[in-house]
């Protein structure tokens, strides 16, 4: 049975569990507290989160013929970098995080399947540092699928760089 996230939060909001858990972690690490920094309810962003472009396919299994859209599934997240900007390693993780948050930020648990997402990065030049990072650190394979289209293979979410 799928759970409605709003109902679940409302039902459990009477008891504030996070402060107790935070305190118990501080006690648990008491002997090594000088090596650690503890932050409760750390805010992840100072700016509002926004996906540059979201394309939702009306019919999930209908293939897209255009070369830059062949990778598309139901929910397609696109990050655009202007000609005077570059696609960095941190941009990759930011957009990947947005994809995960987009999947999460709905009322019904798992309504958007992880296998229904894609991520596309559109940038002016070839992002060498990012590609090197993806290949060496993430162990992804990068393959060319047309003029200026590179698939990033090895993740559950299909990713490509244009």
Positions of the model-derived regions?
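Conserved single-residue anchors adjacent to enzymatic active/cofactor-binding motifs
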Residues: 1-162
């Amino acid at each position: 049975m799928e759970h409605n996230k709003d109902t679940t939060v409302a039902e459990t909001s009477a008891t504030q569990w996070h402060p107790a858990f935070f305190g118990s972690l501080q006690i648990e690490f008491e002997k090594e507290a000088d090596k650690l920094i503890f932050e409760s309810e750390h805010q992840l962003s100072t700016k509002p989160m926004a996906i540059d472009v979201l394309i939702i396919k009306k019919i999930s299994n209908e293939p897209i013929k255009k070369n830059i859209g062949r990778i598309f599934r139901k929910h397609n997240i696109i990050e655009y970098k202007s000609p005077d900007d570059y696609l960095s390693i941190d941009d990759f993780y930011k957009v990947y995080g947005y994809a995960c948050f987009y999947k999460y930020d709905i009322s019904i648990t798992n309504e958007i399947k992880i296998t229904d997402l894609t991520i596309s990065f559109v940038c002016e030049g070839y992002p060498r540092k990012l590609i090197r990072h993806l290949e060496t650190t993430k162990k992804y394979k990068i393959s060319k699928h047309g003029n200026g289209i590179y698939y990033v293979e090895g993740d559950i979410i299909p990713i490509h760089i244009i």
